[in-house]
Amino acid sequence: MKKRYVFQALLLLCLTACGSKDEFDATGTFEATEIVVSSEATGKLFYLNAEEGMHFTQGTEVGLIDTVQLYLKKRQLEAQMKSVENQRPDIHRQIAATKAQIATAQRERDRVENLLKAQAANRKQLDDWDSQLAILNRQLEAQLSSLGNTTASLTEQSSSVAIQVAQVEDQLKKCHITVPINGTILAKYAEPSELATVGKPLFKIADMEHIFLRAYLTSSQLESVKLGNEVTVFADFGNAQLTNYTGKIVWISEEAEFTPKTILTNDERANQVYAVKIAVENDGHIKLGMYGKVKF
């Protein structure tokens, strides 16, 4: 009698195992797009309000690096810019006297020409005024050339300083630490009053609303799977607690890899599998690293 009970128990266990195997087509773990935010400036970290578990929207400022030296440098460059602009010549005012002389000489030349026609002046007087006008016009051309060269040189200096100001403003902007995506802080790597250097990790953030299940398929399953297909995803909360979600296949690996030890497939003989990523809208219950199952 005891042997019969043992046989029935083993048979029930076998049937249960076989039945559960058909409940899913693939397994995997949940992951998200994680971004490690690093410092883009060097200086004392004034504050970093990015604690683990906090949620932020894209662009929110969460930290600040010392900006005093950069601010002073910007003020210096602005003063330099003002000095350069003050040296810029007023061309109209500086050539006004020469143009007035040319106008006067032109009137005298015209008067002498009229007198010459009336035989009240001689030719030499007209030639003298023509010569005087030529001298004044050459003088005006020289002034315009000199003032133009000076203006061009000052414009180049002004442009150079403006570029330096833009560089400092960009560096100042990088002292303000912002979050790059809508997401949740997963880890914090720095604290206020520490020295931040370019490239030093400050915190890690992930988009926990739009996550992925990385599952693994055998080659025989690839025929029935296409990008964009909707599938049923089960989040495994342990103790046989499964919650189903709708997912969409967004990526299929182009090459096979050896089956990860923690992954089960519907073909235990398969030693190579293809990874797929299934996009899932998280309702807040799915955690990173949690196991999941897929039904096509």
Regions found by a protein language model. Name each.
Residues 2-12:
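Sec-dependent signal peptide recognition
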Residues 23-25, 178-179, 235-246:
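Short coil-to-beta-strand transition motifs
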Residues 23-87, 118, 124, 188-191, ...:
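Long, amphipathic coiled-coil "stalk"/hairpin helices in large membrane-associated assemblies
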Residues 14-17:
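C-terminal motif of bacterial Sec signal peptides marking the signal peptidase cleavage site
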Residues 217-243, 270-294:
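Surface-exposed connector loops and short turns at secondary-structure junctions
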Residues 38, 255-266:
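Short, solvent-exposed secondary-structure boundary/capping segments
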Residues 29, 45-51, 55-61, 167-171, ...:
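Surface-exposed patches in structured soluble domains
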